[in-house]
Curated annotation (Swiss-Prot):
E.C. number: 6.5.1.2
InterPro entries, A to Z: BRCT_dom, BRCT_dom_sf, DisA/LigA_HHH, DNA_ligase, DNA_ligase_AS, DNA_ligase_CS, DNAligase_adenylation, DNAligase_N
GO MF annotations, alphabetized: DNA binding; DNA ligase (NAD+) activity; metal ion binding
Residues where NAD(+) binds: D37, I38, E39, Y40, D41, S86, L87, E117, R140, E177, K295, K319
Active-site residue list: K119 (n6-amp-lysine intermediate)
Organism taxonomic ancestry: Bacteria, Pseudomonadati, Pseudomonadota, Betaproteobacteria, Burkholderiales
Name of the featured protein: DNA ligase
Biological process, per Gene Ontology: DNA repair; DNA replication
GO cellular component, one term: cytosol
């Protein structure tokens, strides 16, 4: 409650009526939710609690006596032959147990059967079929009447325009949910971002916004889906199956899509087990849900239980803990990832989201902060799904305080004080102190020791973890100062392993300039670029002193790579580590290419297992001879060198007519 909210009960009740009316108008009519569902539910339950104490205050205009918003004026209005009511919600197991007890008491039944199904987070729809043909589709609206969205519904491929069965009722109103699969939503948002168009906040908003387009051509481009789960008008009534589960099976026979995640439940224990089962798999479902629904399975028993003014007495929605909640941004810090990525993180007033107390949420990058206009002091909606890091979804701007502060991205790394860089066309800013930064230390060491870099056998992730955690190694240069005793004392190391690692470290001093450059971990500098740089500059110091214009003269080095190299080399911390490495006895050979006229300028692709060498060794031989080794087969490929167990690359080569040779033939070309 804000500081100016009413305090006495009557005033609080009036405030809730007005506030909920405002929120419902925004949600149902304007399609612009102002609060997460959990916040709306909390306010609505508070209203019901007050009415339970003061039933004399309830009038026909009370929000508890109707379902919600009116139809948009731009669409024709459709009156529902059978009202589209919402469901009562349960948030605690005790409420579910009470629901089961009431049903059994009214029906004088010892045991009940319930149909358990998912509660989708989309838009409720009624489809009216007459003699098997889809004639009208309408939104829920206020429950009594909704919007005619027939033209838009007909664009959804999951919804049949004609039912496929001989025994089709004259009139059948199918109730269900229009929604968007997560993969479709993410793809649509990616495409929108690429075109510079507005992105949707979540799949529910995307589905609702798409369905309520006045131009059905726009809706046709949106990846909407549908699941059937209920029944409206029906003629003749004799068509009606005996149970809800049988109805859904009949829908499937008619060609209607029905969710397979459902089950008939025969006790409270089975109901709670179903709730837990769906909760466990919730984060792996391909669509958003916010709970499960239980319906008395027998239609005869449903009729006996009847309806309240707002919801049926035979059904209940069992909600999961909110995956979105409101809280306040107390501050914005930046974190440095293992690759140097600088990620802004909002420090939040503690809030319960998805059953977990959240105090921090990612803001992704500087552009995202600007796009969402997140400021220190703002009230924000925070979302958490499964193991995904909590994120700030949106800002509640009408709650922004006058003293809210804009965020400024720091220019220096908070861990090592190296300068922060952001290259052209990249959303992520990064710390430039790759060889020195404590946050990047482990990743830098693992890359440095890689077999394609310095090739330090035995220096894997677990050893690196111990070396860094025990402060034995801070930079790659420290590896060459390690003593036998320090290594032998590491967990699961032993004297023999320590001796072997010392030998591997010493052997790595004899390497090539190209491998050394690659081992430094300069962003955008891979093996091939490292070889080109080594061939061009012939020494490490020459590369360290190269400017952007000079770098651009190197084969395949463009502006992004040149900027990355100069940024790395200009950082004093990195230069210091390189000098320490060179002073440790490095002997960096410059490999001379022995150009072979038969392969120079040719493109090779390697696949399968070779009899006398690894693919990496074959690649080195070809590149030294002036050939290029690619990772995939195309029409531009000159040769595919195939060993045993060659896979799809061999098939592709045969399809394209690319010459296929074996290792022996390759060696003949290199002579």
């Amino acid at each position: 409650m804000s500081s100016n909210s009413p305090t006495n009960l009557a005033e609080r009740y009036a405030f809730l009526q007005a506030e909920l009316a405002r929120l419902e108008h925004a949600y149902y009519v304007l399609d612009n939710p102002l609060l997460p569902d959990i916040e709306y539910d909390r306010l609505y339950r508070e209203l019901l609690d007050i009415e339970a104490v003061h039933p004399e205050w309830v009038t026909s205009e009370s929000l508890s006596q109707r379902v919600g918003g009116a139809a948009l004026k731009e669409f024709d209005s459709v009156t529902h032959a059978v009202p589209m009511l919402s469901l009562n919600n349960a948030f605690e197991d005790a409420e579910l147990i009470a629901f089961d007890r009431r049903c059994r008491e009214v029906l004088h039944a010892e045991h009940m059967a319930y149909a358990g199904e998912l509660k989708f987070d989309g838009l409720a729809i009624s489809l009216r079929y007459e003699n098997g043909l889809l004639v009208t589709a309408a939104t829920r609206g206020d429950g009594a009447s909704g919007e005619d969205v027939t033209a838009n519904i007909k664009t959804i491929r999951a919804i049949p325009l004609k039912l496929t069965r001989k025994n089709i009722p004259q009139v059948l109103e199918v109730r269900g949910e229009v929604f968007m699969y997560l993969k479709d939503f993410e793809k649509m948002n990616r495409q929108a971002a690429e075109l510079g168009e507005k992105e949707f906040a979540n799949p529910r908003n995307a589905a609702a916004g798409s369905l309520r387009q006045l131009d059905s051509k726009i809706t046709a481009k949106r990846p909407l889906s549908f699941f059937a789960y209920g029944l409206g008008a029906l003629e003749p009534q004799s068509w009606l199956p005996k149970t809800h589960e049988e109805l859904l099976n009949a829908y499937i026979e008619l060609g209607l899509p029905v969710c397979s995640e459902r089950k008939v439940l025969h006790s409270v224990q089975e109901i709670l087990a179903f709730y837990s089962e769906i909760d466990d798999k919730r984060d792996s479902l391909p669509y958003d849900i916010d709970g499960v629904v239980y319906k008395v399975n027998s239609f005869a028993e449903q009729a006996k239980l009847g309806f309240a003014s707002r919801a049926p007495r035979f059904a209940l929605a069992h909600k999961y803990p909110a995956q979105e909640a409101l809280t306040t941004v107390l501050g914005i810090d930046v974190q440095v990832g293992r690759t140097g990525a600088i990620t802004p993180v909002a420090r939040l007033a503690p809030v319960e989201v998805g059953g977990v107390t959240v105090t921090n949420a990612t803001l992704h990058n500087e552009d995202e902060i600007k796009r969402k206009d997140v400021r220190i002091g703002d009230t924000v909606s925070v979302r958490r799904a499964g193991d995904v890091i909590p994120e700030v979804v949106s800002v509640i701007k009408d709650r922004r305080p006058a003293d809210a502060k804009e965020f400024q991205m720091p220019s220096r790394c908070p861990v090592c004080d190296s300068h922060i860089e952001r290259l052209a066309d990249e959303a992520v800013a990064r710390c430039s102190g790759g060889l020195f930064c404590g946050a990047q230390r482990k990743q830098a060491l693992i890359h440095f020791a890689h077999r394609r870099a310095m090739d330090i056998e035995g220096l894997g992730e677990k050893i690196v973890d111990q070396l860094v955690d025990q402060n034995l190694v801070r930079t790659p240069a420290d590896l060459y100062r390690l003593g036998f005793t320090a290594l032998a004392n590491l967990e699961r190391m032993g004297e023999k392993s320590a001796d072997n690692l010392i030998k591997a470290i010493n052997q790595s001093r004899n390497t090539t300039l190209a491998r050394f450059i690659f081992a430094l971990g300069i962003r955008h500098v891979g093996e091939t670029t490292a070889k080109d740089l080594a061939n061009h500059y012939q020494s490490m110091h020459a590369l360290m002193d190269a400017g952007v214009e000079d770098l651009l003269t190197v084969k395949d080095v463009g502006p992004v790579v040149a900027d990355s190299i100069t940024s790395f080399m200009q950082e004093a911390h990195n230069r210091e580590v390189i000098e320490q490495l060179l002073a440790s006895g490095m002997r960096l050979a410059v490999e001379e290419k022995v150009i072979s006229a038969a392969v120079a300028g040719k493109t090779f692709v390697l696949t399968g297992t070779f009899p006398t060498m690894t693919r990496d060794e074959a690649k080195d031989l070809l590149e030294k001879a002036g050939a290029k080794v690619a990772g995939s087969v195309s029409k531009k490929t000159d040769y595919v060198v195939a060993g045993t167990d060659a896979g799809s690359k061999l098939t592709k080569a045969e399809e394209l007519g690319v010459p296929v040779i074996d290792e022996a033939a390759m060696l003949d070309l290199l002579k």
